From Swiss-Prot:
Organism: Mycobacterium tuberculosis (strain CDC 1551 / Oshkosh)
Taxonomic placement: Bacteria, Bacillati, Actinomycetota, Actinomycetes, Mycobacteriales
Protein name: Uncharacterized protein MT2127
InterPro entries: Methyltransf_12, SAM-dependent_MTases_sf
Highest taxon, organism lineage: Bacteria
Gene3D superfamilies linked to this entry: Vaccinia Virus protein VP39 (3.40.50.150)
SUPFAM superfamilies: S-adenosyl-L-methionine-dependent methyltransferases
Length: 407
């Protein structure tokens, strides 16, 4: 086997020695306070806005690392979860979790993404987070994922974000110039370099969000990785289309949209909103430069667009059903979601208090009209207010949307 073969190349050797992410010891304890973003038990309406959660999914975790596949199998007991990875130690820990929690629905394979076709399987959900940007040929990797996707299936992926990782790339270039490797002496030197950074260095903002950099494995994975690259918005879309897929949308939408929820009547944001969608996303990522990861969904070209297209620009959006996303909600006069808590206006709160996961925006507006709060305005005015409000909340990742049943 040659040194450039996926089973024996620099990335495979790295993950054999430096196990990452940090192994979870107990899934029951971990899931009380944590969740996987793309886990359908939490996010099925983001992946499939047109349908209810389906427990018997066939799920592929492509590049499962130490924990991810076991988490999906644990929270989706009726699903069949197939996991592949190039790290035997990572798969060994997945096996430990499988045995500990009785995960008979989890199947593990020592296999690179480049050899995925040898499984001869297809899937409803293909998850690949933090893997494609480490491949020698990410386009070939994305094509492998596309080839095993069912017609109504979803590819859920994460790629490194270019602008949010500028500080990481600067440090990485320094460490390459110094000839640092992945040995203990290099790690010690890298830690000292990070401690000496001035407060204005671009890495400082990244460090406030990267909570796992205390471990040597995380430091190696971030700064001393054998092969990695970062992506802009347009490069993410290009990677998807190069595999013959369609870009379905962002999982976390907030970094890619202007937010009139916070800055109403902004002429600049209004100008951004007139741009073609991908261009507007690109503009916003160059303004909100802290986003270090892109999480997005892609699907096959022959998947009917009405199954996943969310468009608030027409009155048809009044038939959408807003649902609170995971760990989002209303408490008293406050609204909260992970990392945020704020008091909406009385008019906004009146709409939020009517969200129950069943009412459409039209029905919510009707409920608000009957309560008489806020006062004034016709039903049509309230419907228009609600349509714009829930578009803003959808862009802020506060709500997901259930599409009306077709037919």
């Amino acid at each position: 086997m040659t040194d450039d073969h996926p089973r024996a190349d620099i990335v495979s050797r790295q993950y054999h020695r430096w196990l990452y992410p940090h192994p979870i010891a107990d899934l029951e304890a971990w899931t009380t306070a944590n969740w996987e973003w793309f886990d359908p038990v939490h996010s099925h309406r983001i992946l499939w806005p047109d349908r209810e959660y389906r427990p018997d999914l066939d799920i592929l975790i492509a590049g499962c690392g130490t924990n991810q596949a076991a988490i999906f199998a644990f929270t989706n007991r009726a699903a069949k979860v197939v996991a592949i990875d190039i790290s035997r130690p990572a798969l060994d820990h997945q096996q430990y979790l499988k045995d500990k929690h009785g995960l008979a629905n989890l199947e593990l394979h020592l296999l690179p993404i480049e050899e995925l076709a040898t499984l001869g399987r297809d899937f409803d959900l293909v998850v690949s987070t933090g893997v494609l940007h480490h491949l020698a040929d990410p386009r070939a990797g994305m094509k492998e994922l596309a080839h095993c996707l069912r017609r109504d299936g979803v590819v859920a992926a994460m790629l490194y974000g270019k602008y949010g990782r500028i500080g990481v790339e600067l440090l990485g270039s320094v460490f390459r110039d110094l000839g640092l490797g992945q040995d203990d002496a290099s790690i010690k030197l890298a830690k000292e370099a990070i401690s000496l950074l001035p407060t204005y260095h671009p890495l400082r903002n990244y460090l406030t969000k990267a909570r796992d950099l205390l471990s040597d494995s995380a430091l190696v994975d971030t700064f001393l990785h054998g092969r990695q690259r970062s992506y802009t918005v347009e490069e993410c879309v290009d990677l998807v289309t190069s595999a013959g897929l369609v870009f379905q949308g962002w999982f976390h939408k907030a970094p890619y949209y202007p937010h009139d929820f916070f800055v109403p009547n902004s002429e600049f944001y209004a100008a951004v909103n007139t741009l073609p969608e991908v261009k507007a996303w690109s503009v916003m990522e160059r303004l909100k430069t802290l986003n270090a990861t892109h999480l997005f969904m892609a699907c096959r070209r022959d998947r009917p667009k009405e199954q996943y297209t969310i468009d608030f620009s027409t009155v048809a959006a009044l038939d959408y059903v807003p649902l609170m996303r995971t760990r989002c909600g209303v408490s008293g006069t406050d609204m909260f979601w992970p990392g945020w808590r704020m008091a909406p206006s009385p008019a906004q709160l009146a709409f939020l208090q009517q969200v129950d996961g069943r009412r459409t925006i039209r029905e919510i507006a009707g409920c608000v009209a009957r309560t008489g709060e806020p006062s004034g305005g016709s039903l049509a005015d309230l419907e228009e207010f609600g349509r714009k409000l829930f578009q803003s909340l959808w862009r802020l990742d506060f709500v997901a949307v259930a599409l009306p049943a077709s037919g």
